Amino acid sequence: MHIDARLEEASSNLTYLDILLRFCKNLKIPDDVENSVTEALLLILFIWAESPFYSTKRNMEILCQALSSQIIEQCKEYIKLDVALGNNPEMGIQMLEKCIFCCNVYRSIYDNVMVNVTCYINLNRQWDINQQEVFSKINIFQQRCYDVIEICKALIVFGRDAKIGLIGGPNGTEYEAYLREIQSLFYENLNEIITARDIVFDVTRSIWFIKIKQFRYMDLQLENMVVNLINDIFKNIKNIEEGVEAIYALQKFKERENLRELLQKKWIQVWKIFSSEIEYCYINAINQSRKETDIGVNLLCILRYLRNQYSIVTNALDWIGDCDFGNCVLQRYEHVVDVIDERRKMFNIYSTNATQYL
């Protein structure tokens, strides 16, 4: 009699579990996460409500954990690490963000279903499953996704070929060699991650924390090296054109917040050079004497020079962006150009009148 009861229980459990198993094998994760997760959770509630033997708290907890594991496995299949850590980190970031979103949707649907549906199934029973246990692996997996996104962003900044050769001057070759060294060190760091690729999304392996900690430490060292490079480059910048060319060559470093702030400061440095040029030209124009026969030509040359400098900085605004200091410099530029132009016209009139009386 005892054996018959056990057989009946086993048969019943297998019937219900087979329904869930067949469905979970065909989950459309992450593409159709909302419908897939909703149906899977409703099947679990169906087992909870209808199964005479399997509907215990512990068994329901195991089923929910199994669903979490299945979602993670399908997300892992969706993520192409070769792509993310290879030649297309941007696509890798998109895949990882989609999986993070998928996990968030799963959590949201779980909360909604378990709060709004269970109360209508059986008023005498309460769904008291430990939610922390259900989502513990999901939380770890999401953090691993964020970790890999961090690595992808570092690859965008420090990897690939750099356009450092656009920087002119006698030290251009030296700067390029230094950047190649940074790039080489980055790939050494990245290879440590690629070698450990099997543990990246293995939520049971805590050794990943050591790997990502080591990566972040080296990543910070590389960032400091780039800071030193940028500062060294701009120590030797003497004119607007060199400054704009340098910022253009270093554009990819704007993807990193600290480096973006540093490049913004260097952009202000370029504006300060322009401001100094404006003041120098203004003083030069004011000091032009009527006794000089070529004063009109001199003032015209000053105007053309300033307008050329203006053209260089304003053309760069589209891809560098403006700044408050730059706006002030532009106001000063407009004033100085107007003053010099009026002075040029005045001297032209004076020169014409003086010639008539000769």
Regions found by a protein language model. Give the residues of each.
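Extended, acidic/polar low-complexity N-terminal regions with helical/coil propensity
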Residues: M1-L358
